[in-house]
Regions:
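Conserved N-terminal structural module of periplasmic/extracytoplasmic solute-binding proteins
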Residues: 1-88, 263, 276-278, 300-301, ...
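Extracytoplasmic/periplasmic substrate-recognition and gating elements
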Residues: 43, 212, 219-222, 258-323, ...
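Short helix-initiation/N-cap motifs at beta->coil->alpha
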Residues: 55-66, 85, 151-152, 226-240
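Hinge/lid segment of periplasmic solute-binding proteins
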Residues: 84-133, 145, 152-154, 164, ...
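Short, solvent-exposed loop/beta-turn-alpha elements that line the ligand-binding surface or hinge
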Residues: 100-110, 172, 191-209, 259-264, ...
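Long, aromatic- and glycine/proline-rich binding clefts that accommodate carbohydrate-like moieties
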Residues: 117-118, 269-272, 320-369
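Glycine-centered hinge/linker elements that transmit conformational signals in sensory
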Residues: 156-157, 199-228
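Conserved C-terminal helix/tail region of periplasmic/extracytoplasmic solute-binding proteins
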Residues: 349-401
Length: 401
């Protein structure tokens, strides 16, 4: 396991291509996937041990922690966990080693959407290790055939009324989850918040239609009043307690709704792709990748660790231990796993139809513009027309730097 010395190259970005102990920075390891993964690596790499540094479980705090350490050119953060929406910002600031040339990664066996999400201006900057896509959880005892279109789903709200339940919820509190849900509504109608070149394109009839749908169904009660306070966990609790017919949420809910002692829907629910206009809707793409800091002294070790977490065995472990969506496509066809996790084919459909949230180096300000205006429109504090105009103006202002 040779390699250049830690001082090879010129300047911090090119230097540190050798091997040695590294620190891996990630959000709070709630599902206990990293301790065993790192233990397995360390058992085989005595002189290149990986130490895990856990951050908080709040995405904005994780983001700010990485920013702080990168601005300080801290060599102690060798590998950082990058939420799909941070790629552009970290790449534009030259904080991540481009994964090309000597640092190239083979992405041929990976699903395309997570690779695209880890790419900025045509260059891969991080190694995808877990993807994520939204799914529609539904009560199969009350809805034998899941809705394929939005119109079908909303028409089924009469079933909820018959059973004194609420119909539909997603994540509508004013936080990142609302950007996810608003973007799904807009993209599913054929709208786009920001185009591929970074131009703001949200001021369109399609975007208005998407946001209007959420506002209308909140107003008429199909989306219950309390759903404006829901993040992921509040929606899960409502669904598990039998109060909701439909819930838009991430795959992690599946195992919990099946095993939680308090869940009254254990054998009564199933999942389907998010409904769209004529077929599957456009989920917002979730997930994380791992980037190598340009300030790391041991980039060769970091690259090997990135390759290790993309191996099939590790990807299966992440799936089974943490309900993390694999980035290796073939795993979704693994008969043993599908028998154990029946939602895998639905999740694959979701990821394949997923749309990244706006790709921009100014993401924190852009998502705030989306959240604030979507929230105001759904609550009825602003007309949808005004909310879209204000959103467009605020995103343009943020993108101007």
């Amino acid at each position: 396991c040779g390699g250049g010395g830690g001082n090879s190259g010129t300047g911090s970005a090119a230097g540190g291509t050798g091997r040695g102990p590294i620190t891996f920075v990630t959000g709070k390891d709630n599902s206990n996937v990293w301790a065993p993964t790192v233990a397995k690596w360390n058992a085989a790499h005595a002189d290149q041990k990986v130490t895990v540094k856990e951050q908080s479980d709040q995405a904005d705090q994780q983001h700010d922690d990485i920013v702080q350490h990168m601005q300080a050119k801290d060599a102690g953060y060798d590998i950082v966990t990058v939420d799909v929406v941070w790629t552009a910002e970290f790449a534009a600031k030259n904080w991540l080693v481009p994964l090309k040339g000597d640092f190239a990664l083979d992405t041929s066996k990976l699903l395309k959407p997570p690779v695209v999400a880890a790419t900025y201006h045509g260059t891969l900057y991080a190694a995808p290790f877990a993807s994520d896509g939204g799914m529609l959880y539904y009560r199969k005892d009350l809805v034998p055939n899941p809705p394929k279109t939005l119109d079908e789903m909303w028409s089924m709200c009469s079933i909820a009324k018959q059973h004194n339940m609420n119909c539909y919820a997603g994540q509508f509190q004013k936080y990142e989850g609302l950007t996810v849900n608003a973007a799904e509504a807009i993209n599913t109608q054929g709208g786009q918040i920001v185009d591929g070149s970074g131009k703001v394109t949200v001021d369109s009839p399609e975007a208005r239609k998407g946001l209007q749908m959420l506002a209308d169904h909140y107003k008429n009660g199909d989306i219950p009043q309390e759903a404006i306070t829901y993040q992921e966990e509040q929606g899960r609790a409502a669904f598990e307690s039998g109060k909701l017919l439909f819930l838009r949420n991430w795959p992690y809910v599946y195992n919990l709704a099946t095993t939680d002692g308090s869940s009254v829907v254990k054998d009564k629910f199933a999942v389907a792709p998010l409904p769209g206009v004529t077929g599957p809707g456009a989920s917002s793409l979730g997930g994380h990748s791992e980037g190598i800091s340009v300030y790391s002294k041991y980039k060769a070790t970091a690259l090997d660790f990135l390759k290790f977490i993309e191996e099939d065995a590790q990807q299966k472990f992440f799936m089974e231990q943490g309900s993390l969506a694999p980035v290796v496509g073939s795993i979704y066809a693994d008969a043993t796993l599908v028998a154990k996790y029946p939602y895998l084919p639905t999740l694959l459909t979701s990821i394949q139809n997923a749309v990244p949230r706006p790709v921009t180096p100014f993401y924190p300000a852009v998502t705030k513009a989306i959240e604030d205006n979507s929230y105001a429109a759904i609550k009825g504090d602003k007309s949808v027309d005004q909310a879209i105009k204000d959103m467009s103006a605020a995103i343009s202002a943020a993108s101007g730097g």
